[in-house]
From Swiss-Prot:
Name of this chain's protein: Trigger factor
Family named by the database record: Belongs to the FKBP-type PPIase family. Tig subfamily.
Record organism: Cereibacter sphaeroides (strain KD131 / KCTC 12085)
Role played: Involved in protein export. Acts as a chaperone by maintaining the newly synthesized protein in an open conformation. Functions as a peptidyl-prolyl cis-trans isomerase.
Coiled-coil blocks: none
Primary location recorded for the protein, binned into one broad class: cytoplasm
Amino acid sequence: MQVTETQKEGLKRAYTITVTAAELDAKVQEKLVEAQPDIEMKGFRKGKVPLAMLKKQFGPRLLGDAMQDAIDGAMRDHLETSGDRPAMQPEVRMVDGETWKEGTDVVVEMKYEALPEIPEIETSKVSLERLVVKADEAAIEEALKNLAESAQNFEDRRKGSKAKDGDQVVIDFKGSVDGELFEGGSAEDYPLVLGSGSFIPGFEEQLVGTKVDDEVTVKVTFPAEYGAKHLAGKEAEFACTVKAVKAPKAAELDDELAKKYGAEDLAALKGQISERLEAEYKGASRAVLKRALLDQLDQMVSFELPSKLVEAEAHQIAHQLWHEEHPEEHGHNHGNIEPTDEHKALAERRVRLGLLLAEIGRKAEVTVTDAEMTQAVLAQARQYPGQERAYFEFVQKNPQIQQQLRAPIFEDKVVDLILEGATVTEKEVGKDDLQKAIEALDEM
């Protein structure tokens, strides 16, 4: 077996691998010997079939396996000897693959880009500022007010009052299409909050300004994508009778409100809110700190990037951003999306930082534990109520999904490792300053 270098330019590598006919035949023979003890043929006891007969019957079937094993072995030996780590799966092409005949040498061309040598960074030279926000009384009171509004009740307005946006009207209604009542289109004593958007578009607006005992005919058109296909896109009329008009009234900020949210009393609820707010502030502060760290790391290192990795990342960025701008398009029938120079620059940054963090993690032997993976899967599974088990099984069968869940955990652990050696000072700021810092991340 021979491996000949044909290209070594920057990170690009190309080799010709030659497996001689004799080596390939020996590999086939080896596989036949391995299989012989388990094979039975008429006229022979199990394991006693002559190799010549086995080769005649099974040789062609084993030839492909032997060829693959030989090539894989040559590639593996080459990578171990050279120390190269391919940035992506090597491209492998069999020379004369269409015309190759048994008894001749197998010649394969292998191409790949090697991962670059990545310089070590001195974490002690990294200097960062961590924003610290305390949950003050004003923020807690604001959160309490929002909870009270969420738990609001409705009280009857004075007789003759007109319904306003945000009011609750209690109505009887009967819906019809082309003069015929349709199933599920009628109800009595139905409480509807105007402006909630819970009914067909245009329905609630026509009830603003109505009073108790008013009879109103609401005319709407069902959306084209409406769930009930027989109603989709159809014009409909709803005969409505207004039975009550109620104004919203926020719940009182007292122990009863606290109990609604699972707290023992109002003081305990305030404590829970304070903890939740500070956890939110801490998460936001970490996002700002992490971006600042990545910005510094990006300026500290410079090395050649595998062009194929950058190209793949740029296309992924372009594709993702296109779909964000065209949310109505869910498939891939949109033609080719060419990355812009901005996409390519962002791709270079992501690849550079990704390789740097991966190398730091590799050298420090950073790993993602089974427990951490389980927590990540559980967090994702909660997005599919009632289908958690199915999601677990889906993840178990999909290494790509596992890697998507593992990657951010690994990255965060490497970030923590770098922060341990960096100089990080704390700066206490208000929540508005933190919010501005978060908003600035989206603009970059």
